[in-house]
Amino acid sequence: MKRLFSNVINLTLVLIVGVALSGCTVSNASIGSSSPWSLVDLDTEANPLDVDFVDDKNGFLVGTNRLILETNDGGITWKERNLDIPSEGNFRLISVDFKGQEGWIAGQPGLILHTTDGGKNWTRLDLGNKLPGDPYLITTIDTDIAELATTAGAIYKTTDAGTNWEAIVVDTSGSGGIRELRRTNNGGYISVSSLGNFFSVLRPGEEIWSPHQRASSKRVQSVGEQPNGDLWMLSRGAEIRFNADPDDIDSWSKPIIPIVNGYNYQDLVWDPSKSIWAAGGNGTLLVSNDEGKTWEKDPVGESVPTNFIRILFLDDLNSESPKGFVFGERGNLLRWQG
């Protein structure tokens, strides 16, 4: 009788899981035999959050707990760089961006740094309480010109090296506050609301965010651009979706669930060979070489005891080889070797 009762319970669980995953594409990902990634020793417990390069060799990495590191060998090794940051503040440096010798760093709370000589010297700008929200993303446009996005969904532009900031977005109510924000290739923005219950789009030239509903009842983790400009979405429950209709931003594919391990995905990106990478909790780093149909676990990512929070491939810097990084917690960083 106990065995019969146990079998009934097991069958019921199977049916529940089957119903829950109906309509989803689920893959049992195996571990790959090799990896294009290598682990970088940052010698820090801070979380790396962003990186950019002045040229092929010289670059800066920023992160939590006032983390600023500099490399002179293309990202193989990094050393601490001390800049003019108030000693009493535990700043979260969240964004760094260069265009030639012109560069910016944005941090929370209320910190902006600017350089015009490739990072040799930096000027600290005091934002005070001028802008709603804290700095979240900064983009170098040209000499003395930059765009700054804040945690309130406000977008500002400076044309005089940060002395004055002009509002691009007049009404931020459509953003719902943000948990994540990205700049698109054409100069627009995509944001996910602070609660993950919708996402918003700001197209170039617009002054108001356009909100869009999530694809299911599950909260949105992240939304970004595919190489062709269509969108992708990551939702709770480790679900991946792609735009089903290029002419309809609210049309989504059925969810893809590469593996079921209890951890959500935090980021999705295409590498230079157009393979798709997904990153998430507990060392989750997956790759698909067939447009998301099947997935494979990366062996290096699998061996690192961290939560991966971001994957970044940098634009062409006239580099000898593409530059890519996977950001993990507690000082973990992977570097692309190709």
From Swiss-Prot:
Signal peptide extent: 1-23
Bilayer topology: Lipid-anchor
Pfam family, one: PSII_BNR
Name recorded for this polypeptide: Photosystem II assembly lipoprotein Ycf48
Quaternary structure, from the entry: Part of early PSII assembly complexes which includes D1 (psbA) and PsbI; not found in mature PSII. Binds to the lumenal side of PSII complexes. Interacts with YidC.
Localization: Cellular thylakoid membrane
Family per similarity comment: Belongs to the Ycf48 family.
Originating species: Prochlorococcus marinus (strain NATL2A)
The organism's taxonomic lineage, starting at the top: Bacteria, Bacillati, Cyanobacteriota, Cyanophyceae, Synechococcales
Reported function: A factor required for optimal assembly of photosystem II (PSII), acting in the early stages of PSII assembly. Also plays a role in replacement of photodamaged D1 (psbA). Assists YidC in synthesis of chlorophyll-binding proteins.
Lipid tethering residues (N-palmitoyl cysteine): C24
Keywords: Lipoprotein, Membrane, Palmitate, Photosynthesis, Photosystem II, Signal, Thylakoid
One GO cellular component term noted in the UniProt record for this chain: plasma membrane-derived thylakoid membrane
PROSITE patterns cross-referenced by the UniProt entry: PROKAR_LIPOPROTEIN
Gene name per UniProt: ycf48
Main location: membrane
Residues with a covalently attached lipid (S-diacylglycerol cysteine): C24
GO annotation, biological process: photosynthesis
Spans traversing the lipid bilayer: none
Xref: InterPro entries: PSII_CF48-like_dom, WD40/YVTN_repeat-like_dom_sf, Ycf48/Hcf136
Origin: domain of life: Bacteria
Notes concerning its domains: A 7-bladed beta-propeller torus, about 55 by 55 Angstroms, with a depth of about 25 Angstroms and a central pore.
